[in-house]
Amino acid sequence: MKQSNKGFDHSYNAQAVVDAENQIIVAAEVTDAANDKRQGVPLGQAALDNLDAAGIERPQAADGTLLPIPNTLDSGYFSEEAVEKLADMGLDPHIATGRQKHNQAPVAPAAGAAPTEASVKEKMAHKLRSAAGKALYAARKHIIEPVFGQIKSARGIRAFLLRGQEKVSAEWQLICLTHNLLKVWRCATRAVAS
């Protein structure tokens, strides 16, 4: 990956999908891709596969049809293809379409449905401007960001110790497993204390 010193380092990009309720890592992968644009779909599929393997049922409507599972991703993951594929998989993607500049006036909330002739990007921007979209996307910083903060700051894991993508991937899986064990242990001790 290109680094700020204008050179290239062999670096890895750690990815994770986290549940909103307990900050349990549901899926984790490592890639050597410099950006996240092509990572949302494989991560979404891995999360669904892991939920299915764990026997966790997807939410259903009263008539038994599967409800889309909301998920939020930052602007680095946005592509029209990703939005469409995630929706086809049974997810309800909320992906930022770009960055808001500092000191920029907030965008007015969206009212009603997006125009039918709007592009995927325009529909996503409209969705994120709705009250529900804003609330869901704002929760993202309380769901995924603390997980990476806990791993990097609280546990001091700032770099991988192994080399080679297969070994680094195994190391990342172990880091995520220990994170999940700590979360489960804390949930269990809170339940016992109650």
Kindly give the residue locations of the regions a language model identified.
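Anion-binding and metal-coordination hotspots
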Residues: M1-S194
